[in-house]
Amino acid sequence: IKENFIFFISSTSAHFSINSALIILSLFVNDKELGRFTLAYKVAFILRMVPVFFIQSALQQASKSFTKSKEEYKVYTSKYFKFGLLISFVISSLSFVFSDLIIYILAHEKINYSSNILSLISFVPFLAMLNFKNITYILVNDLKFILNKATFYTLIFMFISSLILSYLYGGYGMALSLLLTELFSFFI
């Protein structure tokens, strides 16, 4: 029960750090700006799932290769990591370049603010992919305590940075906070 509770806390912390952005931003901006931010945020949120899919698809084989040989595990995860970085960079770059078109298709009108926000947060998937090796190692070795600790620290960082940056810069501050949170998650 204790192990499952630790995993539950970790999952809850990760959920809050991802989904609390709109709630926090709503404290500092009007409804119009929040709606325009949300339009871009939802696109980036879907793209943010790409690294999650990579981790899920690699986890079983990574576990098998880890039990066979540490060297085989390193080769496998490095290969998968490089491929994931390439794919997430291409996806991020395309969403950056075509942010105006993406927003136009979704909103049926040109919204510069949403396009600018999407341009900023389009690299969240790439930054999240940087954490592939760390997360895979933690999951393969069943290090739930470390995962819980890391997600909790990331949650605290996200709350503090998003409160400060959203207060100072509105949606642009939240976009910056989301990018910084992904970097912070990688470095801890």
Model-derived segments and their meaning:
Residues 70-86, 93-98, 115-118:
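Interfacial transmembrane-helix starts/ends
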Residues 123-153:
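Membrane-interface junctions at transmembrane-helix termini in multi-pass inner-membrane proteins
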Residues 1, 54-60, 129-137, 164, ...:
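C-terminal transmembrane helix end/exit motif
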Residues 5-8, 21-22, 35-51, 82-83:
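Alpha-helical transmembrane segments of polytopic membrane transporters and translocases
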Residues 44-70, 74-77, 135-140:
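Helix-loop junctions and terminal segments of transmembrane helices
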Residues 33, 154-187:
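Membrane-interface helix-loop junctions in multi-pass transport and translocation proteins
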Residues 1-18, 61-75:
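Interhelical loop/hinge segments that connect adjacent transmembrane helices in multipass membrane
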Residues 96-129, 172:
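Interfacial segments at transmembrane-helix termini and the short loops linking adjacent helices
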